[in-house]
């Protein structure tokens, strides 16, 4: 994704950014909502969402059907039954400054035509950092509970929610509607969270990164008995479907919810007037925040009058009558006691700050990320310094600055990044040089498979949930088996399951016994039969993620065929000179082909010797190049001779057909193709794979059908789908052999339009493309 300011983006760059933002935010949504394991901080996530919205605002005709601005949460997990919400559970727009809070008040007034001199009342509620839930009551009795899911369809977690003491099984008092969906937040108090993590760590069990993850993971347990053992709490402060009105204002509704047995919020919501009231209450909640005993990440402002809420209505995925004013990330000062280096499975070295324990937002922090050596140098952070750390609530805290006023005297020496890996082999570290000649910020251990730290990380990746997901083989057990030499590569895991001698030794060990060993063997044997997509992902090759693994598995009938294609591609990889030319600004695939073609003759004659204008010469030598490309090439090479030699060298280093075929697979591309080829080019990788394949029954994944009414066609879904989610529609179409696109073009074969279809429907009509309703689509694919 580009870092070009939105105001400077071309339309082509905007299309590319929106596509990458959609994929990136979808990945983060799944990590946050389904896996309870966020991968970025709230601030980083909000920045991505804001860039997406800014681009869409500047280019409204480029809004994608799968735009993050149209999405709430994530699709439900398959292990829970679906629950369709009577009224969608929408998210809120965010405000990050006083100016944006004031603008919210101004927007409300403009829409309702209320003058600045008139009063508008708001309720201000603390924004609880937990997991949203909806409770359906019929005649006062709790009949169903669900998570938010994607906002329209959530997960049925009724039995789990019944275990929370704050949730009444029967409403108190009287006057409640016959049917009401009460909505709120499941959360965990900080003290209870700390106590659970401490006990789990002592028992060698999984700990959680923060209270929000803990609450989500605890509620979304298959066994409600586990949820019952967790210290979950619930605040109820909103509603969805109701059979009849029960209040005239947000404030009155909170009072009724409290009468019926719900804890609304603590500290209690407050009613404020006009824009200044919004700012004042925000300041009050910010002061209270560290004292609450649970996490809040902002204040929610809602127009108090429910009739005004009705008139304001909704826009896209959020109400016009409410907004969340987010708090900045929490900060604290502490002492940097050491800098340790962690080694990833691909050899990437990540420096981690070891800190004197400090409490930030109620959570004890002892580690913080330093990202890379360049970041350490930029901050000039030194061991012994007092540093300012920032905790965004979701990921490992980071050091944001050094408190120079507190630097010891004499000052500690500047940190020198080690030149060798911290593993016992102490192999040298290296910084890769990109094709454009720039040095990577990441240092890597050059020991590769010989490095024991990398080997352990490879094994951890192999048994991870989205790879082989072997029950009973956690990180501690894996580390112990590696240190003993029992498991040094993936195939050893399956050999262990039938090694009677080792299993007998294991049964006698403390913490194992007959049952534990039996469960371990059962978990291993259950994964001897594995899908080809999981097999590919489990290998841990660089740049080969889950999505690419699935694409590869669908394009090859057997794993052996994939390996043969990758080995052939390794013999046809592009050379460095070709890659260098391909990274020149403005040089896209077509321009690259023209330049390489010009260099194939072995000599590129100077077309205009009488001038020194290199850009002009390049334009004559390769006439169809764009002006930006000519300028970039002139700047890169400097002289005609250097340019001509570069073309000849690039042509000689052009990739062969075997590589091009692999890279041309839709969803693979050059980066993944090169990484996969280089993985299988290594002798030790091929041996490791051969050992593993001998232990497994690798199953092909389901291929898209080719004999359906839509096979080979390009489909676009637009508008609201009422009988399935957009993800379900996409999966259905792809399973039937169709390709699903996000925008309508001359290449589109069919548009499925639901209510609210806009510009895509108009474009399809203008182009004469077939359009059908959702019901017609379902009838078509059923036949």
From Swiss-Prot:
Required cofactor(s): Mg(2+); Mn(2+)
User: What protein am I looking at?
Assistant: DNA ligase
Q: Record-annotated residues binding Zn(2+)?
A: 421, 423, 445, 451
Q: What is its EC number?
A: 6.5.1.2
Query: Pfam family of this protein, just one?
Result: BRCT
Supply the enzyme class, top level.
ligase
Quote the record's binding site residues for NAD(+).
42-46, 91-92, 125, 148, 185, 302, 326
The similarity comment for this entry is: Belongs to the NAD-dependent DNA ligase family. LigA subfamily.
Coiled-coil portions: none
Ranges of residues in domain BRCT: 705-783
Tell me the active site.
Answer: 127
Task: Please give the GO cellular component terms listed in this UniProt entry.
Answer: cytosol
Q: What does this protein do?
A: DNA ligase that catalyzes the formation of phosphodiester linkages between 5'-phosphoryl and 3'-hydroxyl groups in double-stranded DNA using NAD as a coenzyme and as the energy source for the reaction. It is essential for DNA replication and repair of damaged DNA.
Origin organism of this chain? Answer: Caulobacter vibrioides (strain NA1000 / CB15N) (Caulobacter crescentus)
Q: So which domain of life are we looking at? A: Bacteria
Catalytic activity reported: NAD(+) + (deoxyribonucleotide)n-3'-hydroxyl + 5'-phospho-(deoxyribonucleotide)m = (deoxyribonucleotide)n+m + AMP + beta-nicotinamide D-nucleotide
GO:BP terms for this protein?
A: DNA repair; DNA replication
Q: Which gene encodes it?
A: ligA
């Amino acid at each position: 994704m580009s870092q070009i300011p939105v105001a400077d983006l071309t339309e082509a760059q905007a299309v590319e950014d929106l596509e990458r933002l959609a994929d990136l935010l979808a990945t983060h949504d799944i990590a946050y909502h389904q896996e309870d394991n966020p991968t970025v901080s709230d601030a980083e996530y909000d920045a991505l969402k804001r860039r997406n919205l800014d681009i869409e605002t500047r280019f409204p005709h480029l809004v994608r059907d799968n735009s993050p601005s149209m999405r709430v949460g994530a699709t439900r997990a398959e292990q829970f039954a679906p629950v369709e919400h009577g009224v969608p559970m929408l998210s809120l727009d965010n405000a990050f400054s006083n100016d944006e809070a004031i603008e919210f008040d101004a927007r409300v007034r403009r829409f309702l035509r209320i003058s600045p001199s008139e009063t508008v009342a708001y309720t201000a509620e603390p924004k609880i950092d937990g997991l949203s839930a909806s409770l359906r009551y019929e005649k006062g009795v709790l009949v169903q509970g669900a998570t938010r899911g994607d906002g329209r369809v959530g997960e049925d977690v009724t039995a789990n929610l019944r275990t929370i003491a704050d949730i009444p099984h029967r409403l108190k008092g009287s006057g409640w509607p016959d049917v009401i969906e009460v909505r709120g937040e499941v959360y965990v108090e900080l003290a209870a969270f700390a106590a659970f993590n401490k006990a789990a760590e002592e028992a060698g069990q999984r700990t959680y990164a923060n209270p929000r993850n803990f609450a989500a993971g605890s509620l979304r347990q298959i066994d409600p008995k586990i949820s019952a053992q967790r210290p979950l709490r619930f605040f109820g402060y909103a509603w969805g479907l109701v059979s009849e009105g029960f209040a005239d204002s947000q404030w009155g509704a909170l009072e009724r919810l409290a009468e019926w047995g719900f804890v609304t919020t603590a500290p209690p919501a407050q009613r404020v007037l006009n824009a200044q009231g919004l700012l004042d209450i925000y300041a009050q909640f910010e002061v209270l925040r560290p004292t609450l005993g649970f996490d809040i990440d902002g204040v929610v402002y809602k127009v108090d009058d429910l009739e005004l809420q009705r008139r304001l209505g909704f826009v896209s995925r959020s109400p016009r009558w409410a907004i969340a004013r987010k708090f900045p990330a929490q900060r604290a000062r502490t002492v940097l006691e050491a800098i340790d280096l962690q080694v990833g499975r691909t050899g990437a070295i990540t420096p981690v700050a070891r800190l004197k324990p400090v409490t930030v937002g109620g959570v004890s922090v002892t580690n913080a990320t330093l990202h890379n050596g360049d970041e350490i140098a930029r901050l000039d952070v030194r061991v012994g310094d007092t540093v300012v750390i920032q905790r965004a609530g979701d990921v490992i805290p980071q050091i944001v600055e050094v408190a120079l006023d507190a630097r010891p005297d004499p000052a500690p020496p500047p940190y020198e990044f080690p030149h060798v890996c911290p593993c016992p082999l102490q192999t040298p570290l290296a910084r890769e040089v990109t094709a454009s000649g720039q040095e990577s910020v990441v240092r890597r251990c050059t020991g590769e498979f010989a490095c024991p730290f990398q080997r352990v990380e490879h094994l951890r990746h192999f048994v991870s949930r989205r790879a082989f997901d072997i029950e009973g083989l956690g990180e501690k057990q894996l580390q112990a088996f590696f240190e003993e030499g029992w498991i040094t590569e993936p195939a050893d895991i399956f050999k262990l399951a039938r090694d009677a001698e080792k299993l007998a030794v294991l049964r006698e060990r403390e913490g194992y016994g007959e049952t534990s060993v039996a469960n371990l063997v059962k978990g291993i044997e259950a994964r001897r039969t594995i899908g080809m997509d999981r097999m590919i992902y489990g290998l841990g090759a660089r740049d080969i993620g889950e999505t690419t693994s699935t694409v590869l598995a669908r394009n090859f009938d057997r794993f052996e065929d994939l390996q043969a294609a990758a080995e052939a591609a390794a013999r046809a990889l592009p050379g460095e000179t070709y890659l260098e030319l391909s990274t020149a600004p403005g040089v896209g695939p077509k321009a690259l082909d023209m330049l390489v073609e010009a260099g194939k003759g072995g000599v590129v004659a100077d077309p205009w010797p009488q001038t020194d204008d290199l850009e002009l010469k390049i334009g004559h030598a390769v006439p169809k190049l764009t002006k930006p490309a000519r300028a970039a090439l002139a700047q890169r090479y400097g002289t005609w001779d250097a340019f001509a030699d570069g073309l000849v060298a690039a042509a000689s280093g052009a990739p062969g057909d075997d590589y091009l075929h692999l890279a041309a697979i839709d969803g693979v591309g050059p980066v993944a193709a090169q990484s996969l080829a280089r993985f299988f080019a290594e002798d030790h990788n091929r041996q490791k794979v051969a050992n593993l394949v001998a232990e497994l029954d690798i199953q092909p994944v389901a291929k898209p059908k080719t004999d359906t009414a839509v096979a080979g066609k390009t489909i676009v879904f637009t508008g609201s789908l009422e009988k399935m989610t957009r993800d379900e529609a996409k999966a259905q179409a792809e399973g039937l052999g169709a390709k699903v696109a996000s925008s309508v073009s001359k290449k589109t074969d069919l548009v499925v339009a639901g209510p609210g279809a806009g510009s895509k429907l108009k474009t399809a009509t203008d182009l004469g493309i077939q359009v059908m309703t959702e019901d017609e689509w379902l009838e078509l694919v059923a036949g």
